[in-house]
Amino acid sequence: MLGLLVALLALGLAVFALLDVWYLVRLPCAVLRARLLQPRVRDLLAEQRFPGRVLPSDLDLLLHMNNARYLREADFARVAHLTRCGVLGALRELRAHTVLAASCARHRRSLRLLEPFEVRTRLLGWDDRAFYLEARFVSLRDGFVCALLRFRQHLLGTSPERVVQHLCQRRVEPPELPADLQHWISYNEASSQLLRMESGLSDVTKDQ
């Protein structure tokens, strides 16, 4: 009996050591919460809010929220956002899927232990290959935007225009992208072209 308990304990420790268990638990929970417990959001451009709090496991050596945690929390918020507005469901019906192709983060103020915050996510627009989303980390203590993240959500197997048309049952013109986002898109394109040249690949070879 003792041997079995030791084996189970060792197995549990190995699972936690080799897998990001809490990520694998929280991500489906975020999807289920968005799908079953929250109302559908019909406006694709509406801002959605995802609550959070800085836990001891989120801290770095300076007792601030670790920079990597911002991307992680934004991941949960973005999946919940795409679930509530129907984009993930539409992709499933169209037999397509999406991958994160690019991201950038601007940190304005640290989030500290036990500080409550919201991740406010909104769709900024789209082009012929990807959706562009923004996530703001807002402290609930004073409303300060502590971090601003941008994401390029690339679609495989379909186009953003077709997904939006599938959801709205009509053709919808994409909103004009903010100037700073357009600069970021240009940077990504220039970076892709430079990397293709360094690798000896032709312009026909596309990345995400």
From Swiss-Prot:
Chief place of localization: secreted
Pfam families (UniProt xref): 4HBT_2
Keywords from the UniProt entry: Phosphoprotein, Secreted, Signal
Keyword Cell membrane: no
Signal peptide per UniProt: 1-17
SUPFAM superfamilies assigned to the protein according to its UniProt record, in alphabetical order: Thioesterase/thiol ester dehydrase-isomerase
Keyword check for Transmembrane helix: no
Phosphoserine modifications at: 199
Highest taxon listed in the record's lineage: Eukaryota
A GO term from the CC aspect: extracellular region
Location of this chain's protein in the cell: Secreted
PANTHER family according to UniProt: PROTEIN THEM6, PTHR12475
Similarity field: Belongs to the THEM6 family.
The name this protein goes by in its record: Protein THEM6
Species of the source: Homo sapiens
Organism taxonomic ancestry: Eukaryota, Metazoa, Chordata, Craniata, Vertebrata
